[in-house]
């Protein structure tokens, strides 16, 4: 397994729409494993393949405290959503920035697991929010797109400054 490079805004590759996975094979499973390794290394709770410049419909999530409840979503589809909620969300592609984002309180999805087996999942709370956040990535949408233009500009400037400082170090 290896840690992949996470793209940061304003990288336009984050805006690409991911294509469906045609076959879950050893290559896809390797990508899933690398994505988990990357997500844990970056201390995230979710990661979409788009964020690591792989434009396929793959998501990995682990919202557990012990980091031992891996969830793989390949070709996820939103079937139902209900209620309203929101938390201050962060994103590995928008480092050290957070903002309140409106989300559905509950979701029902269909996806393939790491072995290509179809399943359905009903989720609420943090897991439901994380699923929605990561599914947005698959269509090129970021949490900051829900914010006002002024807030978006401020976030972009802060991230660009952080990346410049990191490049000098």
Swiss-Prot record:
<protein>
    <recommendedName>
        <fullName>Peptide deformylase</fullName>
        <ecNumber>3.5.1.88</ecNumber>
    </recommendedName>
</protein>
<dbReference type="GO" id="GO:0043686">
    <property type="term" value="P:co-translational protein modification"/>
</dbReference>
<keyword id="KW-0479">Metal-binding</keyword>
<feature type="binding site">
    <location>
        <position position="133"/>
    </location>
    <ligand>
        <name>Fe cation</name>
    </ligand>
</feature>
<dbReference type="GO" id="GO:0006412">
    <property type="term" value="P:translation"/>
</dbReference>
<keyword id="KW-0408">Iron</keyword>
<dbReference type="Pfam" id="PF01327">
    <property type="entry name" value="Pep_deformylase"/>
</dbReference>
<dbReference type="GO" id="GO:0042586">
    <property type="term" value="F:peptide deformylase activity"/>
</dbReference>
<dbReference type="InterPro" id="IPR023635">
    <property type="entry name" value="Peptide_deformylase"/>
</dbReference>
<feature type="binding site">
    <location>
        <position position="137"/>
    </location>
    <ligand>
        <name>Fe cation</name>
    </ligand>
</feature>
<comment type="similarity">
    <text>Belongs to the polypeptide deformylase family.</text>
</comment>
<dbReference type="GO" id="GO:0046872">
    <property type="term" value="F:metal ion binding"/>
</dbReference>
<keyword id="KW-0648">Protein biosynthesis</keyword>
<dbReference type="InterPro" id="IPR036821">
    <property type="entry name" value="Peptide_deformylase_sf"/>
</dbReference>
<keyword id="KW-0378">Hydrolase</keyword>
<comment type="function">
    <text>Removes the formyl group from the N-terminal Met of newly synthesized proteins. Requires at least a dipeptide for an efficient rate of reaction. N-terminal L-methionine is a prerequisite for activity but the enzyme has broad specificity at other positions.</text>
</comment>
<feature type="binding site">
    <location>
        <position position="91"/>
    </location>
    <ligand>
        <name>Fe cation</name>
    </ligand>
</feature>
<feature type="active site">
    <location>
        <position position="134"/>
    </location>
</feature>
